[in-house]
Amino acid sequence: MSSHLARLEALLFVAGEDGLSLRTMAQLLEIPVTGLTQSLEKLQAKYKADEDTALCLLESSNTYKIVTKPDFACLLRDYSKTPINQSLSRASLEVLSIVAYKQPITRAEVDDIRGVNSSGAIAKLQAFGLIREAGKKDAVGRPNLYATTDYFLDYIGINSLDELVAIDQLELEEQETSLFREDAPEDLEDLDN
């Protein structure tokens, strides 16, 4: 069986940013709080003594968590700012899907499909290298056209746009039309009937 120290470390690791209270850890490990306190002190000493670990134990308001040592703050701040390590929002995923299937497409055309402004999502997707400007549309104002990049293909794990899942155009149009059915309730009171 694993040592109390290893089991404690595993619990704290899984708890992540939320951390765990003394009481919760004692219950889960089935040990008294005094024994737990000693294990926490040992774990902290282990982290402090090991120059090859980036981890330390943090206690705040009787909640304990495993965090990175303050020495790594600048490195981790720089890492978190890199576009590839930020997740895509739902809006960005919607825009990316629209661009992938309808490319080349203008921002206004994306906005028309979504019903909201997509400028922020387009800028984010460009910063991530997932979409690019693909010329200008021959129309009033000569708006930018957007298309996906080779990195987009790598990002979603395909070799060409031909591998995108086919969307039946009629099914898509039916779904769009059903949103605006004539028999749809005009106000919330009709939903109760």
Swiss-Prot record:
Domain of life: Bacteria
Chief place of localization: cytoplasm
InterPro entries assigned to the protein according to its UniProt record, in alphabetical order: ScpB_csome_segregation, WH-like_DNA-bd_sf, WH_DNA-bd_sf
Keyword Cell division in record: yes
Keyword terms: Cell cycle, Cell division, Chromosome partition, Cytoplasm
Subcellular location: Cytoplasm
Keyword Protease: no
GO process annotations (BP): cell division; chromosome separation; DNA replication
GO terms under cellular component: cytoplasm
UniProt xrefs under HAMAP family: ScpB
Function in brief: Participates in chromosomal partition during cell division. May act via the formation of a condensin-like complex containing Smc and ScpA that pull DNA away from mid-cell into both cell halves.
Subunit structure: Homodimer. Homodimerization may be required to stabilize the binding of ScpA to the Smc head domains. Component of a cohesin-like complex composed of ScpA, ScpB and the Smc homodimer, in which ScpA and ScpB bind to the head domain of Smc. The presence of the three proteins is required for the association of the complex with DNA.
Protein family per UniProt: Belongs to the ScpB family.
Protein name (database record): Segregation and condensation protein B
Naturally occurring in which organism (per UniProt): Streptococcus thermophilus (strain CNRZ 1066)
